[in-house]
């Protein structure tokens, strides 16, 4: 006799029915194998409960302060970098700085006064300037414009 697909059967004991608990008074009935009373016999304990040990959410410190959603984060460019990128002087704005690879587009630019321009006259337009940067740019014969 040849074996065909409809002759195949699972091995005895390989497929057992799921135990349905809490149905009647037989085995796994009434208390459904949970014993009597106590927190384990009732629904469930919270995920934060660690068996009496001080839970992690109480061990860690509370975070102080808040996150200001109106905070403005500037991209910073120093004068020494401007002198490197624009040795011939001329107009310098956020678009030129993006093209030169000094900043990324989409965020405001602030010019800081680290280094010096080496006598290069620049007409710089940016969203913010430090006081020392303004002084050094005007001293070199350039001008500043806040956007």
From Swiss-Prot:
GO annotation terms (biological process): translation
Any one GO CC term of this protein is:
cytosolic large ribosomal subunit
Task: Please verify whether the record's keywords include Ribosomal protein.
Answer: yes
Stretch list, region Disordered: 1-42
Provide the family line. Belongs to the universal ribosomal protein uL15 family.
Q: Which NCBIfam families match?
A: rplO_bact
Q: What is known about its subunit structure?
A: Part of the 50S ribosomal subunit.
Q: What is this protein called?
A: Large ribosomal subunit protein uL15
Tell me what organism the protein belongs to. Answer: Salinispora arenicola (strain CNS-205)
